[in-house]
């Protein structure tokens, strides 16, 4: 575990990152074994503590329920409360150390953070698209919404083990995920499209790829062109996997409430750390690519452009959500919870995007 996290070994799974790891088969796949260690809460910080038995999770002061679980104070029903509960009750502490007294230490990044980002990157999700039905607008959009709901589950799990993220208050964690989910989804889509179709089609899932016909039939052709253009920019830049992973985290950390977060200082420190990680990733890129300074500028401009595209995608999402009955477009319960809570905040101008370059 120590060698993998510190980057001495970069393990890769020969399967689909879902190998069974138990007492007998623990040596079959080192990559899945390390992933399971991270999900179970192993971290380098705990090894340095003189009293490992007193290491506490974020939620240890929470009130137990009758079922033996734990709940967060003031949490309600639905996705946001369940997401908050999932973030707060998971044993995983995302490599954020706790002091002997149980208090959180300031968020930090362990050595070779890219090794950790590679290990926790979610697996590709299948849409379960019904190819026996015609590619009608409502069928395509409903399928995309169902896929987005599945992906959101992975986003929450990814955030739980993201180095530094668990050091933020639960309210801040939920807010950042809620404000960035569309950008994260479209950015990951662009990466898959870049790797699997060389930027020619939109690779939403292995069983749901948009060609030109599906783009036009989806009723969001211009938005599809925008997402494909991002993927083609990946092709032009020959974006590396390490750069993509660092940029993805920065998208999570780039939209905040206008009044700020509960712990704005911890958030800003975490964001600065990941900006440094992006610069390190650029420094590792092949020397045949653009000059380092110019490349960093190009990547941050691309991140800024993602916010503009994400805003347009949200507008379309909000429209189809409001007109879902008339358009016969279905939304999974998770997206209903997120969008219902997000619409008033976005449309009231309560969000603030952190751009790298002046608009």
Curated annotation (Swiss-Prot):
Transmembrane segments: none annotated. Zn(2+) binds at residues 13, 19, 29, 32. Aldosterone binds at residues 145, 151, 192, 320. A zinc finger (NR C4-type) spans 13-37. 21-hydroxyprogesterone binds at residues 145, 151, 192, 320. GO terms for molecular function: 11-deoxycorticosterone binding; 11-deoxycortisol binding; 11beta-hydroxyprogesterone binding; 17alpha-hydroxyprogesterone binding; 21-deoxycortisol binding; core promoter sequence-specific DNA binding; corticosterone binding; cortisol binding. It comes from the Eukaryota. Residues 108-339 form the NR LBD domain. Keywords: Cytoplasm, DNA-binding, Lipid-binding, Metal-binding, Nucleus, Receptor, Steroid-binding, Transcription, Transcription regulation, Zinc, Zinc-finger. It is found in: Cytoplasm; Nucleus. One of its GO terms (biological process) is response to cortisol. Progesterone binds at residues 145, 151, 192, 320. Pfam families: Hormone_recep, zf-C4. Residues 157-160 are annotated as: Important for coactivator binding. Residues 50-107 are annotated as: Hinge. GO terms for cellular component: apical part of cell; basolateral part of cell; cytoplasm; cytosol; membrane; nucleus. Residues 48-96 are annotated as: Disordered. Residues 1-49 bind DNA. Receptor for both mineralocorticoids (MC) such as cortisol. Binds to mineralocorticoid response elements (MRE) and transactivates target genes. The effect of MC is to increase ion and water transport and thus raise extracellular fluid volume and blood pressure and lower potassium levels. Composed of three domains: a modulating N-terminal domain, a DNA-binding domain and a C-terminal ligand-binding domain. Belongs to the nuclear hormone receptor family. NR3 subfamily. This is Mineralocorticoid receptor. It comes from Oncorhynchus mykiss (Rainbow trout). The gene is nr3c2.
